[in-house]
Each structure stands twice: as C-alpha cells, then as structure tokens.
Regions:
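An N-terminal domain-cap segment
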Residues: 1-3, 20-21
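C-terminal terminal-subdomain/extension
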Residues: 2, 64-113
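Short, charged beta-turn/beta-strand-edge "cap" motif at the junction between a beta-strand
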Residues: 15-19
Length: 113
C-alpha cells in the first residue's frame, strides 16, 4: 500500500545538479501510487521560498498550514527529482486547485498540453 499520494508535501533530501550534496527540503509528490508500489520511488518537485526570484511555471501554495510549511512558498515545476519513498516524511498537502495548476505546468514543460 502506498504511503504517499499526488499532492502530498514531503520533506526529502533534494539533489542539486550543481553540487555533490543534498539538502533536506520540502517537495511536492507528483507521481502516482503506482511508482511507489512498483519501485518504492517518488517523483517530487522542489518547493522553495516565495521570496526567491520567481521562475516561469512556479505555482503559489496558498494554504501554508495545510501544506505544513512555515513561510510563503512556491512549487518550482522546473525542478523535478526521483527520491526513494523511505527517505520522505509527510508534512501536509496542497489544495486540489493548486495540484491542478501544477499538473498543467508540468504538461506544458513536457508538451502534453
């Protein structure tokens, strides 16, 4: 049985392409339960402070308390990683409206829409 669902906000060791280290940070689960059930993996998008310079495709997180986030944050749809589900800790979840917007932005990036 999967532990995580699309739309969950998790804390994970997010990898960086420009460093050999990983930093523990919030991320959004965008994969379906099938990936976790078959391979114990999650596809996640970076969540970053809304104070950082915005990127095209960023999605605001409106309900910080429900997402388990302490400060204004955005989902950075251009930054995706594959994480072992055992390394993730659930913090909360984003709204259905925000998840739909994230899905639309991902679709644009991979030309599904």
């Amino acid at each position: 049985m999967p532990t995580f669902r699309r739309g969950d906000v998790v804390k994970v060791p997010f990898p960086y392409t420009d460093r050999a280290t990983r930093q523990s940070r919030p991320a959004l689960v965008v994969s379906t339960a099938r990936l976790e059930e078959a391979h114990a993996l999650l596809w996640v998008l970076m969540i970053t402070s809304a104070d950082n310079r915005g990127w095209p495709g960023d999605v605001d997180i409106s309900n910080l308390a429900a997402a388990g986030l302490p400060i204004a944050s955005v989902v950075r749809t251009a930054k995706i990683a594959t994480i072992e589900s055992a390394d993730a800790t659930k913090l909360g979840k984003i709204s259905a409206k925000a998840l739909k917007q994230v899905s639309r932005e991902i679709g644009r990036l991979v030309e599904l829409e």
